[in-house]
From Swiss-Prot:
Name of the protein in question: Beta-ketoacyl-[acyl-carrier-protein] synthase III
Cellular localisation: Cytoplasm
Pfam families in the record: ACP_syn_III, ACP_syn_III_C
CDD domains: KAS_III
InterPro entries: ACP_syn_III_C (IPR013747), ACP_syn_III_N (IPR013751), FabH (IPR004655), Thiolase-like (IPR016039)
Domain notes: The last Arg residue of the ACP-binding site is essential for the weak association between ACP/AcpP and FabH.
Annotated signal sequence range: none
SUPFAM superfamilies (UniProt xref): Thiolase-like (SSF53901)
Heme among keywords: no
Enzyme class of the recorded protein, top EC level: transferase
Annotated pathway: Lipid metabolism; fatty acid biosynthesis
Record-level Gene Ontology MF annotations: 3-oxoacyl-[acyl-carrier-protein] synthase activity; beta-ketoacyl-acyl-carrier-protein synthase III activity
Entry similarity comment: Belongs to the thiolase-like superfamily. FabH family.
């Protein structure tokens, strides 16, 4: 029996309402708007208050369901990509399943950091092609404000909270053209968080900030920024070139590239090395900062909402993250 094809039915997103500007950060750490924008391209980021990761994921899921015109009962599988789950167990996916009442679906989490959503797209596609599922909800969601050291200007300026989602469905036409995934554990220590508490919420941040230094050890994100920058540029180019080659397409055939929104300077370097206009990349890092697994689906949902993609257009999703991991996918909009 011939395997089924897969396409994206709908997308959704949710951003918490609290926006923290660079100017706001300058009141609590030694930084300023120009310093942050010059190095990262970030102007502001969203932060949760009183919301868990599952709450953000639930709202993005409901948005995608509404736009797709389907009920939660029609979902066969829910995949949540996150490094900031509500708990060690149960999975955030199961909590979201309960919240949206998608009781016919099975659900699980994956942890691939900023590459997680594209990993989820790959997994969902395989379940559909193999006939195990017909409709799959893939969510990328993070509440990174739990893991940010608000005294460290090198990291707290970068991250934000948010959630994006996509519903994949079986199709007669091929929408998910190619996926390329990779990882290299030799770089595991370049970007890490050894936090023993995954349920720190915004109300507890003040307590953490007033704690003794030894109490804070290992609770926050640690990153070798220079090495991550070099790694990111290399694997993003590698990922883009790989999915183009496997799809027998060229850069001129691509309408949009949706990159992981980690640092505007990374995207600029990739564009320069590929010899393409930066306008081919969809960029929203100035509004939201780095939302890890949520960054690509949030951007995809925005592109969808704005009507920037028409039937037959080609879009590349490409990202990188802790692990080290990287992922790219070439999608035809149908």
């Amino acid at each position: 029996m011939k395997n089924k094809e897969v396409r994206i039915l709908s997308t959704g997103k949710y951003l918490p309402p609290i926006s923290i500007s660079n100017h706001d950060l300058s009141k609590i750490i030694d930084t300023n708007d120009n310093w942050i924008k010059t190095r990262t391209g970030i102007e502001k980021r969203r932060i949760t208050k009183g919301e868990n990761t599952s709450d953000l994921g639930t709202k993005a899921a409901l948005d995608a369901l509404r736009k797709g015109g389907i009920s939660p009962e029609e979902l066969d599988l829910i995949i949540v990509a996150t490094i900031t789950p509500d708990y060690f167990t149960p999975s955030t996916a199961c909590i979201i399943q309960r919240n949206i009442k998608a009781y016919n679906a099975f659900a699980f989490d994956i942890s691939a950091a900023c590459s997680g959503f594209t990993y989820g797209i790959s997994i969902a596609s395989q379940f559909i092609r193999n006939g195990v599922a017909k409709k799959v909800l893939v969510i990328g969601v993070e509440t990174l404000s739990k893991l940010v050291d608000w005294k460290d200007r090198n990291t707290c300026i970068l991250f934000g909270d948010g959630s994006g989602a996509a519903i994949l469905t079986e199709s007669n036409e091929k929408g998910i053209m190619n996926v390329y995934l990779g990882s290299d554990g030799r770089g595991a220590d370049l970007l890490k968080c050894k936090s023993s508490s995954l349920t720190v919420n915004s109300d507890e941040l003040k307590e953490l900030l007033n704690s003794k230094e030894e109490d804070l050890e290992n609770k926050f994100i640690e990153m070798d920024g220079k090495e991550i920058f070099k790694f990111a540029v290399k694997v993003m180019i590698k990922g883009i070139e790989k999915v183009l080659k496997d799809s027998n397409l060229e850069l001129k055939d691509i309408n949009y590239i949706i990159p992981h929104q980690a640092n505007l300077r990374i995207i600029e370097h990739v564009a320069k090395k590929l010899g393409i206009d930066e306008n081919k990349f969809y960029i929203n890092i100035n509004h939201y900062g780095n939302t890890s697994a949520a960054s690509i689906p949030i951007a995809l949902a925005e592109v969808d909402e704005k009507g920037l993609l028409k039937k037959g257009d080609n879009v590349i999703l490409v990202g990188f993250g802790a692990g080290l991991t990287w992922a790219a996918s070439l999608i035809k909009w149908i």
